Structure formats: C-alpha cells, structure tokens
UniProtKB/Swiss-Prot annotation:
Its cofactor is Mg(2+); Mn(2+). It is found in: Peroxisome. Belongs to the isocitrate and isopropylmalate dehydrogenases family. Keywords: Glyoxylate bypass, Magnesium, Manganese, Metal-binding, NADP, Oxidoreductase, Peroxisome, Tricarboxylic acid cycle. One of its GO terms (molecular function) is magnesium ion binding. It catalyses: D-threo-isocitrate + NADP(+) = 2-oxoglutarate + CO2 + NADPH. May play a role in N-alkane metabolism, glutamate synthesis, and/or NADPH generation in the peroxisomes. The lineage of its organism: Eukaryota, Fungi, Dikarya, Ascomycota, Saccharomycotina. GO terms for cellular component: mitochondrion; peroxisome. This is Isocitrate dehydrogenase [NADP] peroxisomal. Binds 1 Mg(2+) or Mn(2+) ion per subunit.
Length: 411
C-alpha cells in the first residue's frame, strides 16, 4: 500500500457535531474517511444537546453564522428535546430544533435525495434513478394560525394595508355551530427564492424539474406558486434548460404522485411545505430505507450550503452501545453529509481534486455494499437476511468503506 497523498481543501468547512449514536459514527467517519485523505480546516461547533444547553443554544446560531461566512457546513444528526429529553439531560429549557434554527438563519430550500444501491431491494421496483424532493421550508401550515370556533357566528379575513389604504374584508364562513378555522400565508419573495433554488439545482444536475400544487382548488394561493415558477422559467431559465435538453413542467399534486409511482425516477419535484414534508419520507422508504436519504439546505445565490443525514440520532442503538453491546448502525447518509459538503466546497473553490475525492468516497460506499456485500443490519434485512453472518458492526462497515476506497485509489 502506497502512502496516502493528502489533498488540500482550500477554504474552511463548518463542522457541526451531534448526539448519541450518530455522534459516535461522525467521529469514526472523520478519523477513518476524511482526515487521513484531506488537509482541511474544520471550524468545529458542538451541537450536542449538553453543549447547546450550556451555551443557551448560542452555539447553534454561531454555527449558522459561520456557514454564512464560509459557505459550506456539514452537520451530524442532533436531538430535538421533548419533555423526556429535558428531564434526561436536566436541560434549562426545551430548546428548538437545531435544523429549524439553521434554516431560519440561512434561509434557502431543503432538497432530499435517496441514495440508490443496486442490490438493495426497492419497495417501488420501477424506481431506477433518484427522485429529488425540493421542499419549500417556509410558511403555509407550519406558520399558520389555527383556532377552535366555539359557537355559531361569522368568520372573516381582514387585511389592513401598512400605508393606511382601504381595509379589505373577506367573508370565510358562516358557522351554525362549533368548528375549526385556519389562516396561513406565504410571500412572493420566499416563493421566488424557492423557485430559483429549484431551477439552479435542475441545471446543475441536468434533471427535469416539476412543481406540484393544487391550483385548481386554491386558484390564488397555489396559483401564485405556479405563476412565479412559470414566470422565472420563461424569463430566466428556459434557454439554458433547452441547451441541456431538460425542461420544467407544472403538475397537479394528485397527478404528480401518481406519475411518480409509475416513473423510473431521475427528476426533481419542487413541493410546497406540507407536500414536501410528506413526500420526502414516501420517496425515502420507496427506495428502500430512511437511512439512505441525503438532505441539503441551499440558498438561491449558492453562497450558503449545509448537508446532513435525513435521519435522527439512532437512540435505540446508542442505548445498546451504552450497555457495551455491539451495534450495526447504517452510516451511509452521514458519510454523504460529508461528501456533499466537500463537493460543494470543491466547486466553490474551483478545486476539482476535492470534488473527485468526494465522488470516489461515494463510489466506495456504494461498492462496499453492492460489490463487497458488506452492509449493516438494516440493509441485510431488506434482502430478507437475519443471520449474524450477513451483516457487520457499525465500525466494521466504515472500515470496509476505507478498504474499498484505498483499493479504488490504488493505495
């Protein structure tokens, strides 16, 4: 084995550590798959629950500001505390989701993409190529005002212009008795950012782009999404997409999900907040596993980018680890959190050797499973295998990836 020639990463990467089993995996990945091959300045932020509590969650906003400063961040999975976690860690308060905090500071769109491995059976067998779900992570149900209507009466929506113009009233419903009501919103600026990010990813990945709404029912609300996407396509992106042989199309959400099931994959769907939330999990499971899903947050100007695994901290395995028992935890999505960040860093820095290394690492991950038949328990189970010899431990899998990477790189 020849000596490893380290590649230098020109600019820093923001590294955000996490919790429980994923924190252990994160360290293995860094020690075995990143640092032996790269000279990289990692700006380290500990987003583990104890340190977030110690800093009153300031560490999370500091990490977000650092991503805005340096352009690229990679994040380990983190605990979002509930009542039980507050008690378990004796927390000062129930801190917000770190992902939510990062999104609020950075802005941008969340794109979730499945990792496709040939020998992992798919629940939807026709899906050969990835389906990327772009989720508009602003407004709608997630920032709505929902109320319980106590008795009969009139419900109205009132708009009061800031410039002192005429107040507008919109009758909503005449209640004969108790019920519920909901008022939600979105903004042209946020929808435009969402559309820009979606078109840019389509061009970068050379994939067709769909957007989906229910504009036949919500003619003005969903119509606004449709109009903004179509306006940008015509004025800014159609020529470039034509050159690449790709296109954009709006589809009704019900038609879109039906077409999705019949298709072979290989496209992007830009979805409203709720639709994207639901469909990204359906897509992940359809491709075989929630453990095979990448998640990136990207701003429309491309200046801020954050990648992470689209799963939690794997508490159940961590409890086994704490008891000294062996674990077989899937680290693939966490490895991809690093590789997607490195690819973005390499593109921004114009260092193709960094991009090439990250792509080689992704290839090594896939081949460890598909060629070497080395996999964790969850992947073995998808093949109907339950015997102990069919899977390896958490650390053995990462060692397997390192061996495959060295073989492919000629070390």
């Amino acid at each position: 084995m020849g000596e490893i020639q380290k590649i230098t990463v020109k600019n820093p990467i923001v590294e955000m550590d996490g919790d429980e089993m994923t924190r252990i995996i994160w360290q293995f990945i860094k020690d075995k798959l990143i640092l032996p091959y790269l000279n990289v300045d990692l700006k380290y932020y500990d987003l583990g629950i104890e340190y977030r509590d110690k800093t009153d969650d300031k560490v999370t906003t500091d990490a977000a500001e650092a991503i805005l400063q340096y352009g690229v961040g990679v994040k380990c999975a983190t605990i979002t505390p509930d009542e039980a976690r507050v008690k378990e860690f004796n927390l000062k308060k129930m801190w917000l989701s770190p992902n939510g905090t990062l999104r609020n500071v950075i802005g941008g769109t969340v794109f979730r993409e499945p990792i496709v491995i040939d020998n992992i059976p798919r629940i939807v067998p026709s899906w050969e190529k990835p389906i990327i779900i772009g989720r508009h992570a602003f407004g709608d149900q997630y920032k709505a005002t929902d109320v319980v209507i106590p008795a009969a009466g009139d419900l109205k929506l009132v708009f009061k212009p800031k410039d002192g113009g005429e107040v507008q009233e919109f009758p909503v419903y005449q209640f004969d008795g108790p019920g519920v009501a909901l008022s939600m919103y979105n903004t042209d600026a946020s929808i435009t950012d969402f559309a820009e990010s979606s078109f840019q990813l389509a061009i970068e990945r050379k994939l067709n782009l769909f957007s989906s709404t229910k504009n036949t029912i919500l003619k003005k609300y969903d119509g606004k999404f449709k109009d903004i996407f179509e306006g940008l396509y015509a004025s800014k992106y159609k020529t470039k997409m034509d050159e690449l042989g790709i296109w954009y199309e709006h589809r009704l959400i019900d038609d879109m999900v039906a077409q999705m099931l019949k298709s072979k994959g290989g496209y992007i769907i830009a979805m409203k907040n709720y639709d994207g939330d639901v469909q990204s999990d359906i897509v992940a499971q359809g491709f075989g596993s929630l453990g095979l899903m990448t998640s990136v947050l990207v701003t429309p100007d491309g200046k801020a980018f954050e990648s992470e695994a689209a799963h939690g901290t794997v508490t159940r395995h961590y409890r086994q680890h704490q008891q000294g028992k062996e674990t077989s935890t899937n680290s693939i999505a966490s490895i991809y959190a690093w590789t997607r960040g490195l690819i973005q860093r390499g593109k921004l820095d114009d260092t193709p050797e960094v991009v090439k290394f990250a792509e080689e690492l992704e290839k090594a991950v896939i081949e460890t499973v598909s060629k070497d038949n080395i996999m964790t328990k969850d992947l073995a189970l998808t093949q109907g295998k339950t015997d102990r010899s069919s899977y390896v431990t958490t650390e053995e899998f990462i060692d397997g990836v390192a061996n495959r990477l060295n073989k492919n790189l000629g070390y």
